[in-house]
Design a protein with these regions (language model features):
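Sec-dependent bacterial lipoprotein signal peptides
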Residues: 1-20
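Short, solvent-exposed S/T- and G/P-enriched segments that are highly enriched in secreted/extracellular
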Residues: 46-61, 81
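Bacterial Sec signal peptide processing site at the extreme N-terminus
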Residues: 22-35
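Periplasmic OmpA-like peptidoglycan-binding domain that tethers envelope proteins to the cell wall
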Residues: 158-227
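Periplasmic peptidoglycan-binding/tethering modules of Gram-negative envelope proteins
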Residues: 60-69, 73-154
Length: 227
């Protein structure tokens, strides 16, 4: 299903589409807070230790983001999540484990995952599935990242809600939001055959649904790459 506002949104994005998609270096100017679970992992940037998580890094390109690493003893990174908070602000969350998969990786049938996490606040109005115009710059960059750095990789686009509302409504809304993001990425040149659309409703919450702040983080759409 193509969102009702998609043609208008594509018009807004056309200039960026013509200027950015063919470059070999994707610009990604962001203030990034690096976080680890468990806490206090050693953070390395461009091969040098910059202290323990949480810590802040300013980046200018996707290569800069790729060069941020975290180490926690003999534990493995089982999930890496870039939580987009605004077009110029994000958290990079390293989740560690020992010989295990994250629950989401298990259900998707992959070992580890790199997740681009778009909260409802960034991408959608409450209970809607039309993309916000403010979300387009970062989704343009997302498409460029997929086309330049992961041109053949399978990509999961997954939607989620909080625990309020009925299961039926939440599943339907989460799927429509995932489809809206996928349609936009395809319009930006990502091969639709690579995209797998999933709607999980309230499942796989990243925070507790007991608080407004937690529910806000659970209302999200993710672009997920197997690692």
């Amino acid at each position: 299903m193509i969102p009702r506002r998609l043609p208008a949104l594509l018009g807004i994005a056309l200039g960026a589409a013509l200027s950015g998609a063919c470059t070999k270096e994707v610009k990604l100017k962001m203030a990034v807070q690096v976080v680890s679970q468990p806490e206090a992992a050693e953070v390395r940037y461009r091969g040098k230790s910059i202290g323990a998580a949480p810590t802040d890094v300013s980046i200018n390109t996707y290569e800069d983001l790729q060069s941020i690493l975290a180490v926690k003893g003999d534990l493995d990174v089982v999930e890496k999540r870039l939580r987009i908070q605004a077009p110029d602000k994000a958290q990079l969350i390293f989740k560690f484990g020992k010989g295990e998969q994250s629950p989401l990786a298990k259900v998707l049938g992959v070992q580890n995952v790199l997740i681009f996490d778009y909260s409802e606040k960034v991408a959608f109005d409450s209970d809607k599935f039309d993309l916000k115009p403010d979300a387009l710059p970062i989704l343009n960059t997302q498409a460029d990242i997929l086309n330049v750095y992961f041109p053949k990789a399978q990509v999961f686009v997954c939607g989620y809600t909080d625990s309020t509302g009925t299961d039926e409504h939440n599943l339907r809304l989460s799927l429509k939001r995932a489809q809206a993001v996928a349609d936009y990425l395809v319009a930006r040149g990502v091969d639709k055959e690579r995209l797998k659309i999933r709607g999980f409703g309230k499942d796989y919450a990243v925070e507790s649904n007991a608080t407004p702040a937690g529910r806000a983080l659970n209302r999200r759409t993710e672009v997920i790459l197997p690692q």
